[in-house]
Amino acid sequence: MALSVLLALPFIGSVIAALLPTNARNAESTLAGLVALICVVQVALLFPALGNGGVIREEILWLPSVGLNLVIRMDGLAWMLAMLVTGIGALVVLYARYYMSPADPVPRFFSFLLAFMGAMMGMVLSGNLIQLVFFWELTSLFSFLLIGYWHHRADARRGARMALIVTGAGGLCLFAGALLLGHIAGSYDLDVILASGAIVRAHPLYTVTLVLVLLGAFTKSAQFPFHFWLPHAMAAPTPVSAYLHSATMVKAGVFLLARLWPVLSGTEQWFWIVGGAGLCTLLLGAYTAMFQNDLKRLLAYSTISHLGLITLLLGLNSSLAAVAAVFHIMNHATFKASLFMAAGIIDHETGTRDIRRLNGLFKVMPITATLAMVASAAMAGVPLLNGFLSKEMFFAETVYISSLPWVEFGLPLAATLAGIFAVAYSLRFSYDIFFDPLSTDLPRRPHEPPRWMRVPVDLLVLACLVVGMFPEISIGWALRAAALPVVGGQLPEYSLSVWHGFNAPMIMSVVAIGGGIVVYLWLRKRLEGGRIERPLLIGFFDGKRMYERTLAAANLVARRALLLFGTHRLQSQLFVLMSLTVLGTTFALWGRDFSWGERPLIPISPMFATLWLVGMAGAIGAAWQAKYHRLAALTMIAMAGLATCLTFVWFSAPDLALTQLAVEVVTTVLFLLGLRWLPKRIPLELPITAQTLLRRSRDLALAVLSGCGMAALAYAMLTRPFPQSISPYFLTRTLPEGGGTNVVNVLLVDFRSFDTMAEITVLAAVALTVYALLRRFRPPRETVQSPPQQRALPPDLITDLINPRIARDTALGFMLVPAVLVRLLLPIAIVLAIYLFMRGHNESGGGFVAGLVASVAVILQYIVAGTQWVEAHMELRRSRWIAIGLLFAVITGLGALAFGYPFLTTHTAQLHLPVIGEIHVPSALFFDMGVFSVVVGATLLILTALAHQSVRSHRESAHSGAP
């Protein structure tokens, strides 16, 4: 299987999972499990090509002129992470099948899980630095959705937002660092960057680049001082925690450090920043974990500590330490995933995760207890388990480090202290829960979980045992393949033997185990007695509080800046904007020779001059009437827009004219819907004061100056000869390469299709934002009543005996005739939209114009028939139109990649149909179909959000409570 297919498979599975019915629990889990299983098998089959330092590489051309191609690259390190992502992902899917409640929206869960798996695979397999950052940000996005999966819970929403803000900010720093790194190396290709270590380290921008990259890595892997988000992410379902916070998301940061280790390591800056952050995180996480009373929070802080251990190893500037870091990435993923699953089983079967309430579970859950105790022993570094081996390598590296004397003395002590803490919190997880008398006040009667729910824990704990007892046979080959790309050359000598003799690392292990037991016994009495409620000495240090204070300070600064520089009046904002424009233009032209060009002028037609006089009159009249008569102002704005439309026709630009006309109609409808809910204007007090008159004169002068200045600049530019035009390029290539004769449409859906896809994505985001803002909007009381023209007349009040109404109610059938006419217009407009869409590649039209026509036809039904009638007869599903449109656009682009062409390359097929004859069907037709769908969905979503105000209750007036 090609790497590109391997990368695309989870995303395809995610889309399919999202489309399955809500109650298809078994189908969802089976689909997700098959996708993960196929991926893990395919990744495993690729190992023979990578075992001796080989690299598998696929490159798909995208923007070769700027060095941006889709590069999928797998070496030993990427293979190891891909195995963890897919292997543990498959186990998590099986576990989640039994963990998730029948009331949970399972399609959404498995869709997000597969999408996150695809994002992690994309990041791991990226062979281009910008591409890596893109997938890096995707992991932040999908982790946000997974952490906040139970969005009805406030802690889940807070934890998801915190994780997104912290990791998203780090991602922006990483993006800046990637740009600098690519600038220094001369390429964003990972192979080029990995070979440019000496150049990068000697460059003046090395320190800045290093700090930016490390900010991205530290925020993702919860390194001090960005560690606080991980415990709050425990509000996620336990399968999410077992996947994201053991083997995938939190490993992204240390993976980045390992990936760029040959390029950035080996300097004093690397040693002190990376090593210092890792050491602080190691000690802080381990110490804090001992005091936690929630199972998942204990595991979260222990994860922080182990991530700090890996970071510290990578920061020691030692090849052997880098090998140990890679080894611990593998070991930590296995025992921590099993511990999270065991914690989830305990929570699932007892109804609580509070260690203070859980006792004696070994009596009722002996198998689960045994598995959890073995995994916690691996976490503590007990011999004959995998955690012991990498911990011994860590101890050895701290003992034999060559640095400053105080570092050589203090680092082994700190490592031993962290080991003591690890044993203590591991005992809290195991002994406190499974021994002592059985708790009797649990929310549920505890018992063993379903057999298949426990199978993932069985397999992971078995891996801990096998690796711990037979490391060279079971994992040595994989470790060598994964570590070789990290060290960037020949591997250092090391041994994975269980016994290395009685040496300094062994003494440190004995001290850690013995000291951990003592600390646990001392701590247990005080925790049970309630004498300790928070970590000693550092209880005042609360990362969450610091985070919230930082956000509050930023919000305060923004509010004060808004009060100082901002205004809620549009007139003041426009005054500042236009004043700055005039001043900037004047400054740029000051002292320069400003003159008209020498191009010959076209004789002006009296008809054209009359047309623009009408347009100018409409614009001026709209400005005059906007304050007094809104409907008249709207009519005059439409008159100015119609003049612009006819101007395009005059200059033989039918596509622009058609688009302008459709946009004018949509804009008019938008204004009509919006003006309905504006409060009535308060009559102006007369006479007008001198201050008001002065302000209006100032605004008039600025408006005239701005308008005349823009006209003068435009005239000066248009009367000068144009530089070399790009028009011949498109005119000669549109038909042979784009398969159409309409240059404008082919330009949009072929030559510049990626820009168009970005634009419809922005349009979709804007529509969803407007909908979200208007969803909770309530019109003021004074706008709820119908206008006088629509109110009931006396004859209605007399004759309507079935539904008696008062004079303020809506008149019976006041829009009956227009409603009938507009309903008859709907099918005609839809046929017209289809006609415009189908002819767009060769004649005036296209998906954008067709979408606007269809949208206007539907929204007119709302205007004349009302919201309730339309939605009782039509099921619009506006958001699905947007989603389907974006999906069409993306699939069209990926289809070109599948055939070896650049993204969104158009292919034209010649078909011969009976009766119709020969036709040509360009693949851009499907892209244009996506544009049509997004335009329909976005336009209807925005306009119907306004239309829905008519069926909502009013809000109180701002002056309703005034005496």
Model-assigned labels for residue ranges:
Residues 66-70, 354-357, 439-446, 494-496, ...:
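Cytosolic juxtamembrane amphipathic/interface segments immediately preceding
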Residues 444-585, 706-711, 719-734, 774-809:
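Membrane-interface and transmembrane segments of multi-pass membrane proteins
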Residues 1-2, 15-111, 180-203, 207, ...:
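Transmembrane helix-loop-helix hairpins at membrane boundaries of multipass inner-membrane proteins
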Residues 91-132, 141-449, 587, 600-603, ...:
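Hydrophobic transmembrane alpha-helices and their helix-loop junctions in integral membrane proteins
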Residues 61-80, 196-210, 399-411, 494-502, ...:
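Short aromatic-rich membrane-water interface segments that cap or initiate transmembrane helices
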Residues 83-84, 130-136, 167-170, 204-216, ...:
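Alpha-helical transmembrane segments
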Residues 602-611, 623, 677-832, 837-841, ...:
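Flexible extramembrane loops and terminal tails that flank transmembrane helices
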Residues 56-66, 189-198, 390-403, 473-499, ...:
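Membrane-interfacial helical/loop segments at transmembrane boundaries in membrane proteins
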